[in-house]
Amino acid sequence: MRDITRPEVWAPDADMVEVVVDGTGTIMARSDGGWWWSEPLPPGTLYQFRIDGGMLLPDPRSLSQPDGPHGPSRIVDPALFDRPATFSADLRGAVGYELHIGTFTPEGTFEAATTHLDHLVDLGVQAVEVMPVADFPGEQGWGYDGVGQYAVHAAYGGPEGFVAFIDACHARGLGVILDVVHNHQGPEGNYLAQFGPYFTSAHHTPWGDAINLDQPGSNEVRDFLLGACRQWLVKYQVDGLRLDAVHEFQDDSPRHYLAELSDEVRAWERETGRELTLFAESDRNQPTTVSPIGSVPGALGMDGQWADDVHHALHSFFTGERDGYYIDFGTADVLKQALTKVFIHEGGFSTFRGQDWGAPVDPASGLYDGHSFVVSLQNHDQVGNRAVGDRISHSTPLGCQAAAAALYLLSPFTPLLFMGEEWAASTPFPFFSHLGPELGPLVTEGRAREFERMGWDAEIPDPQSPATRESAALRWDEVTEPDHARMLAWYQELLRLRRDRPDLASGSLAEVSMEVLDEDTVLMRRGTTTVAATRARDRLVEIPVEGEVLVAWGEYGPVPGGHAVTGPGSLVIDTKAD
């Protein structure tokens, strides 16, 4: 593992590189492969690089940027990472909880977030998924415009705060998954191209030139990304990574970058004696993403992948929305397919995309199971990319959220909650960022135009306004209010059932079945547990399933051959108690 006190940088085309401390530059020594290095610096030292007499630049591998991506880098004391490993867990199938450090609390810091970890334990969460903490411009933002892939955002608490947060999670039995964005760099503070061929025009992405994974110089670029992953997993002792939008990795090399990462992570597991988990966000609906390396052509070896079709099926069914990418969703039959087959688009035509899409999941292959697919009812994308960042509870009865939650939390998949979902938080999660005076207004104007084209007539919150970020900060004082407390208790009961009942802990896709009772109501059967969920409004729905009602949302009672519940709502029934 590299010496983090010794400045070193890859600048293959440079004639001279200096390390600059307190305004004084010292010429660095050149080694093979275009690398430059200097003698170690004391912890706390602020330094920058200067290439061929040009501008001062931050260290691309800096662990700390106290003044943001435009400022100097800081040497972090290696002793920060000298601590024993106390936690290890396979996070496939674990109940995850996605949170954004900047809005999980009003303070927006790791330290403040730690004060609410016991709430997550009581809820039944087993792992927190932290939205990106890699350094990005400004004080607050979602983090997907990060530019310091090794540095922890200073406003959150920097590397010291992150280590303390991870240790606090582990002390409570919570795993930590970190969201990393390696498919692009943000537009502000991105100095990588001044050091070497980190980008290539051979491929194009929504953000411009692609990260260079397969052109000249790509070996060092791949090592740069792998090194960041190793830092989080080995040095910081994060337990898993969520890899953002892997479908945007443009890599035509014989060995795909993700396959290389998978192999490296397996080696790090052997080195550390800890289980490490890779989750990939992908919209390609390809089971090869989670197929073991070498098992089938194109296998990438990820441990899990996001399955957005399940979200779309739940959201569209319970809200009635059918616009945009929801156009192929919304019916009970589609919901049935999503909860049993994972993908709605499994090789057939996607109306939204205008082409055939995806491939079927084959449970009989033995290459993966339900725990290989991460599902959610809400997440940062599906809430935050709405015009005003509204949650499902803001536009539908609470019973609809409760019924949808019962289906996905008790499904054979890996469930992921979004912060505040468990009590139907009143706060929205709109998009916000804190870019400079040149880029900030462009983002604001572009976002307004985007939603105008989509037909939204609501006033779009200004992403650059501090008030937009403040509106997203969770209100922890509302948790005890009646409706919020009722939803929280519902989520706690569902997660208790998932933990305590073997039928529900299993990831077997072969042992889940769905039945459509009517256009508003479905049954999900898993062993001796049946989940009834209905979106019916203010009417009694008969559920022809006998047994003991374990938990219920909505007024219910016995009827011949089963039970009846007033919708929207849900019953979870133990059929072995018949």
Question: Can you say where each PLM-predicted feature lies in the sequence?
Answer:
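The feature marks proteins involved in alpha-glucan
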Residues: 1-6, 26-98, 105-108, 119, ...
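Short, well-ordered beta-strand segments enriched in hydrophobic/aromatic residues
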Residues: 9, 529-535
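Short proline/glycine-enriched turn/loop motifs at strand-loop junctions of beta-rich domains
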Residues: 10-17, 44, 537-538, 545-547
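C-terminal beta-strand-rich structural cap/linker in extracellular carbohydrate-active enzymes
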Residues: 11, 43-45, 558-578
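Core domains of carbohydrate- and sulfate-ester-processing enzymes
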Residues: 51-85, 172, 191-206, 324-354, ...
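Conserved alpha/beta catalytic core and glycan-binding cleft of carbohydrate-active enzymes
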Residues: 69-70, 262-266, 270-454
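Substrate-binding/active-site clefts of carbohydrate-active enzymes
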Residues: 87-91, 100-271, 277, 289
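Glycan-recognition and catalytic regions of carbohydrate-active enzymes
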Residues: 344-360, 417-418, 423-432, 457-529
